[in-house]
């Protein structure tokens, strides 16, 4: 889990471009404002979705169905029930009664929740494509 020990929002700069140094990359993520960090919480799409949409990853959203790719729950599928941008974690409902936190990079989106019109516009999905994805079981 990310330690927020030296959290100082004034250290974050929107004009920061990139760095090879891992400590600066970590500093950028830790000190980012929550609305920016929320956009950074992205997960890769499944191969079928990637072929259909032509994009590799999207910001994760409550309602998406995902598959766990790493850890003890590898291979399990669940629905996203909560997102915590402060600790950079996504909570899933798996077979058990508990909610488990996962890092978004360790998940693959299987079904997109496209009920939100703004999300469809952001992903450039028109109504006909949305209906096609729904028919194939790739969208909710």
Curated annotation (Swiss-Prot):
Cellular component GO terms held in the UniProt record: large ribosomal subunit
One GO BP annotation of this record: translation
Record's keyword terms, sorted: Ribonucleoprotein, Ribosomal protein, RNA-binding, rRNA-binding
SUPFAM superfamilies: Translation proteins SH3-like domain
Keyword flag Ribosomal protein: yes
One term of GO molecular function: rRNA binding
Pfam families assigned to the protein according to its UniProt record, in alphabetical order: KOW, Ribosomal_L26
Domain of life from the UniProt record: Archaea
CDD domains: KOW_NusG
Disulfide bridge positions per record: none
Subunit-structure text: Part of the 50S ribosomal subunit.
NCBIfam families found in the cross-reference section: rplX_A_E (TIGR01080)
Protein task: One of two assembly initiator proteins, it binds directly to the 5'-end of the 23S rRNA, where it nucleates assembly of the 50S subunit. Located at the polypeptide exit tunnel on the outside of the subunit.
Stated family: Belongs to the universal ribosomal protein uL24 family.
Protein's recorded name: Large ribosomal subunit protein uL24
Organism: Nanoarchaeum equitans (strain Kin4-M)
Gene: rpl24
């Amino acid at each position: 889990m990310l330690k927020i020990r030296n959290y100082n929002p004034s250290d974050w700069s929107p004009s920061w471009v990139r760095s090879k140094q891992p400590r600066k990359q970590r500093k950028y993520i830790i000190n980012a404002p929550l609305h920016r960090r929320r956009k950074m919480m992205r997960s890769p799409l499944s191969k079928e979705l990637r072929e259909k949409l032509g994009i590799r990853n999207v910001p994760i959203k409550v309602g998406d169905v995902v598959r766990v790719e790493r850890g003890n729950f590898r291979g399990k599928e669940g629905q996203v029930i909560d997102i915590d941008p402060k600790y950079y974690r996504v909570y899933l409902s798996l077979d058990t009664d508990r909610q488990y936190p996962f890092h978004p990079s360790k998940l693959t989106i299987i079904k997109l929740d496209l009920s939100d019109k703004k999300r469809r516009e952001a992903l450039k999905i028109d109504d006909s494509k949305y209906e096609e994805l729904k028919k194939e079981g790739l969208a909710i």
